[in-house]
Each structure stands twice: as C-alpha cells, then as structure tokens.
C-alpha cells in the first residue's frame, strides 16, 4: 500500500512538473510574441511620418473607391463610365505624387515631387468642367474593406481629409496586428521548439514589405489579416474543435475574398487542409467528410452574394481588370497559351520569389540600397537552398522503415499536418500569382504581378523555411533565420530614414527633407518628432531582446525545478 502510494505521488509530481514547464513556456512565448507585435506597430510613427499621402500603390484610387461608396452608397461597377469622385480632387492636388500616380491625375493639376517643391501647389478653384476624372479602375475589387473605411472618411473628409488617410492607414496596421496574434497561436503548434519559433515570428513582424503592404489606404490589410487568421485557425483545429475552427476559418477566408480576390487562392487550402488536420488527429473518415462539406458550404453561402453580384454585372466571378479585359477581347485560350510561351520568366521569378523584393519604396518604386540588396539576395538564396536540402532530409527520415509498434506522437502528427497546410497556402498562392502574371501579360504585354500579392502566404513560407533548416540543425535554424530578421531591420531603417526622405523631398539637405515632409503630413507626424519616432522603433526592439533574456532565464529556472 505504501509503495503504491509513493509511486502515485511521484507520478503526480512528474505530471505536475511537465504541466508547469508547458505553462511557463507558453507564458514566455506570448510575452515575446506580444513584444514582437508591439515592435511591428512601433514602426508606424516613423514610417508614416515619412511616407507621403498617395505614395501607397494606387492609394488615390482606393480612396476614390471609399469616397464613391460614401457619396452613392452603392458598389462601383468596373467600367469606363465609373470615375474617381471629384470630392477627393482638392486633397489629391494639394499633395505631390510619384510618376506612376501623378500621370493619372495630371489633368487634375497634380504635380510630381520635384515640381511640387519648386512651384506653388495648385488650388481646387479650377472649373470642374474643364477636366476629366480618371477611371476608377480599382472598382474591380470587392467592397468589404472599403465599407469599413467609409465611416472614417465620412467623419473626417470636411475638416481633416489628410487625417483620414492616416487614420485609415493606422486602422489597417491594427487589423494586420490582429492577424499576427492568431498566427502566433498557430506557431505554437507549427514550431514546437521555442527559439526557431521566435525567429520565424520576428521574420514576419520585421519584414519590410509585409509592413508596407498594410500601412496604406487599400483593401490589402483586411484581406491579409483575415487570410492569415483563416489559415491559422485551420492549423489550431483538433478533434474536439474541428467543426468550430473549420467554420471560423471559412468565415475568415470568405471575408478575405470579400476584401480582395487574392483570397480565392485560400479556398483549396480550406478544402484540403481541414480533412488533413482532422486525419492527423484521428478523426473518423465519415466525420471528416461531414465537417469539410459543412465548412465548404458555409464558405459558399458567405461568398455567393458577391459572386452573384459579379456575375450579374460582368458575366464572371473573377473580376480583376486583366480577366475582364481578356474576356472582352475575344477568344481566351490562344492568348493565354501565347502569353505562357512568351512570358519573361526570369525577371518574374527574380521579382516575386528569388530573391524577391523585401522592400519597395512606395509607388515611386525606390530601389533598395545596392549593398543591402546584394547581401539579401545571396543570403536568401543560401537559406532557401539549405532549407530545401533539410526538407528532403526530413522526408527521407519520415519515410524510413520503422518497427510496426513504433507510433508517431500526436503532437508531431499535428505539426506535420499543419506544415502541409502551410505548404498548400504557399503553393496555391504561387499558382494564383502565375495565373495573374499570364493573364496580365496576355492583356498588357507584360506581367503586372507584384510581390506584395504574396504577403498573405509569406508567414507560412517562413515556417517551411525554418522547419527545413531545423531538420539540419535547430541552432542553425535559429541563427540563420534570426540573421535574416536583423537584415530586414537594416533594410527597413535605411529605406525609411535615408532613401525615402531624400527621394520624396527631392533634396539631399537633411533638414530641408524633414521640413518638407512635415508640410504634407498631419501635425502629429511632424518631422520634428522623427528622433522620438526612431527611438520608439528601436526601443521596441530592445524590449524584444529583454523579453528573450527573461524567457531564457525563466526556462532555465523551470528546468532546474
């Protein structure tokens, strides 16, 4: 009796120690993850104090969509008759523009950066009948993200229209941060080892283009946040929550589709990922089929109104301007085959994937500093090659014959299924980019596909990268991925602090740069506060390091107990 009692007590102590370590590790993870999300948001003051209004890609078009909804309370139809509302003209011509954006609103009186700083800004007093309004080509997009922005624009458009732009930009950053919270939860399952997990999350939070893509007036932030949330909810599903998580994932993916058509690439991720996650957790086949069918049906019901509206107005459910133009020009198959044959693949791969562009200087398309760009190119290629080798090694280990009695732990099966979901997200997003490149090449004679279209899948690519490196060595994965995150910080700071002010202010005089930038920003983002903004950004990174030190000490103390 005494021996049995002693064994039971020891067992309880052992189980309690394991639970204590798990709880301590989870607390440490959420501390560091929270600090990294704060570091993500802490980049906003400096970046937004530099980034001019309408320098975001197609930003005046996206604001025009919002103003159209505000004026008419109807969804704009993509056609030659749908024009950018004149309500935004006073704000547009009061600001300088990039060449790409300025050419479109030149008839309104808009000036380039160089002309703007050397000539008085035009006024809105010009007779409105003497010029035409640009076509609202962003009417190709679904309305959800813009509908969320309408209250901000409506409240501020009369007295603080410039403030409305920065309020919408800030809201978009907060939406992306919410998506990052769910991704942090999914990382606990995808990356069981703490250090590589932190390195992956740092990559995402510190990636320059991931931030730039959402720090503008556009529909990308909501599409990205809901897309990442949907995939993360799939990864977090288990036997008990499969249906609930599947339905929430379907709702998130539907919201992503209602925001931007890049969300269409996530439909197969849901249909394939949900049964895969359930199968890894031992869910019976019958229940897998039922849950997948229910989730797919809910997704269809949520998206059906958008597709019916699109089909009624365009005769199609994919309504990108390239697809509509291609269909209007006649037979499609021959043009697509010719486009596929003549598409310039090397520049496309270089721009989108290897090495890709981790930083893009707004609609002016400012290039990265050459040394940093070269270093990033070599570093990224080496990491991809090493991760590919590690992935092959991991698969060979998994396929190696083992004794029948040996079973794979449930947590490893769940992680493997989660990695398959990550791979599906990356693969189908890449296929979507290729489709867009082929179609746009057929219509315009060149690919119009941009690297920021990949941003929803980017976090899951980083997971695959780190797990491939982990298969070689866990410490190698942590150091290599952490080094890339540090390089991202250098690229981002140099671009924001050096490249952008010089280009947008059209001068090499540092004092004049910030003075000019202050004149086209709200007072709260004055260039006079730039040092405070820089300290805020760097201070957030210091807090992340302090959090890592604390987590490391906490882990050692827990292990010692």
Language model segments and positions:
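Transmembrane-helix motifs of polytopic, lipid-linked glycan transferases
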Residues: 167-191, 229
């Amino acid at each position: 009796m005494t021996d049995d009692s002693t064994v039971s007590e020891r067992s309880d102590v052992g189980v309690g120690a394991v639970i204590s370590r798990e709880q301590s590790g989870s607390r440490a993870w959420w501390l560091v993850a929270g600090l990294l999300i704060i570091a993500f948001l802490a980049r906003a003051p400096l970046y937004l104090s530099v980034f001019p209004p309408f320098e975001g890609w197609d930003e005046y078009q996206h604001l025009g969509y919002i103003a159209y909804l505000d004026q008419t309370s109807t969804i704009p139809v993509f056609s030659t008759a749908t024009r950018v509302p004149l309500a935004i003209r006073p704000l547009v011509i009061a600001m300088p523009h990039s060449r790409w954006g300025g050419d479109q609103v030149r008839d309104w009186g808009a000036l380039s950066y160089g002309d703007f700083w050397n000539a008085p800004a035009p006024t809105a007093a010009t007779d409105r009948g003497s010029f035409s309004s640009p076509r609202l080509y962003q009417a190709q997009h679904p309305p959800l993200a813009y509908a969320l922005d309408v209250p901000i624009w409506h409240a501020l458009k009369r007295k603080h229209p410039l403030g409305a732009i920065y309020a919408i930009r800030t809201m978009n950053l907060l939406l992306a941060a919410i998506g990052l919270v769910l991704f942090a939860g999914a990382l606990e399952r995808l990356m069981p080892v703490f250090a590589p997990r932190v390195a992956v999350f740092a990559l995402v939070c510190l990636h320059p283009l991931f931030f730039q893509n959402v720090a503008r007036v556009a529909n990308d932030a909501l599409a990205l946040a809901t897309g990442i949330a949907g995939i993360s909810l799939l990864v977090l599903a288990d036997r008990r929550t499969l249906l609930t998580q599947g339905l929430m994932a379907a709702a998130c993916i539907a919201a992503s589709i209602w925001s931007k058509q890049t969300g269409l690439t996530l439909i197969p991720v849901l249909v394939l990922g949900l049964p895969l996650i359930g199968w890894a957790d031992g869910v019976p086949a019958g229940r897998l089929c039922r849950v997948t069918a229910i989730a797919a049906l809910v997704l269809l019901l949520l998206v059906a109104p958008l597709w019916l509206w699109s089909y009624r107005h365009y005769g199609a459910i994919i309504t990108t301007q390239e697809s509509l133009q291609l269909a209007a020009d006649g037979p499609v198959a021959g043009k697509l085959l010719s486009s596929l044959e003549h598409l310039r693949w090397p520049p496309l791969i270089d721009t989108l994937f290897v090495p890709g562009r981790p930083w893009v200087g707004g609609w002016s398309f400012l290039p990265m500093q050459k040394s940093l760009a070269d270093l990033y190119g070599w570093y990224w290629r080496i990491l991809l090659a090493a991760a590919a080798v590690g992935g092959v090694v991991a698969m060979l280990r998994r396929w190696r014959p083992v004794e029948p009695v040996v079973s794979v732990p449930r947590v490893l099966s769940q992680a493997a299924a989660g990695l398959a979901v990550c791979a599906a997200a990356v693969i189908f997003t890449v296929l979507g980019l290729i489709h867009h490149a082929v179609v746009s090449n057929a219509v315009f004679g060149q690919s119009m596909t941009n690297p920021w279209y990949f941003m929803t899948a980017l976090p899951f690519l980083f997971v695959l990268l780190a797990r491939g490196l982990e298969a070689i060595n866990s410490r190698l994965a942590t150091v290599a991925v952490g080094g890339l995150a540090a390089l991202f910080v250098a690229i981002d700071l140099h671009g924001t602090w050096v490249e952008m002010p010089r280009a947008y202010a059209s001068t090499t005089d540092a004092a004049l740069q910030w003075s000019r930038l202050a004149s086209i920003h709200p007072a709260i983002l004055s260039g006079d506060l730039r040092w405070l903004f820089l300290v805020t950004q760097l201070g957030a990174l210091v807090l992340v390091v302090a959090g890592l030190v604390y987590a490391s000490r906490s882990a050692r103390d827990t292990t010692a107990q």
